[in-house]
Amino acid sequence: VFTARTGYTGEDGAELLLSADDGQKLWQILLDRGVCPCGLGARDTLRLEAAMHLYGMDMNADTTPFEAGLGWLVHLEMPAEFVGRQALEQAAASGPSKRLVGLKLQGRAIARHDYPVLHNGETVGVVTSGSWSPTLGEAIALAYVPTNLAKIGQELGVEIRGKAQAATVVRRPFYRHP
């Protein structure tokens, strides 16, 4: 068994890597000891509360680390050459035109992937991930908006079922495990 102190939920935990046969045995032992299985929906809600990015939803091959709030991982001051360095240097120099932000929505409506983000009635961005947060008791989302609107406290809207739902840009993560 290989144990990695990693995870994708923002909670304390570990990932276990083992053979399929050993995995089935361990699964049965855990069930016999009262562990309650959960599905991808629970994992994705925890991921969103922790504001952890999901590739293909919150970022893709066209997203720069600076847009996604991951610029702190890019160390252009180091002399190493790597594929994509020139593109990252250009992106860093010009600055992002959009940013990934956290949104809290008023009411119980849930923003979903690809829902339009509105400002003064105009579409200005797009939701990448959204869900009801059982921990916070409110709807939350990640969305890309123009950099000038990516300020904490900025009032925006999300179009949900043809209606504008009020939303506010908030600090991420939405929830941090104490």
Question: For each predicted feature, which ranges?
Answer:
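Conserved, structured C-terminal
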Residues: 1-178
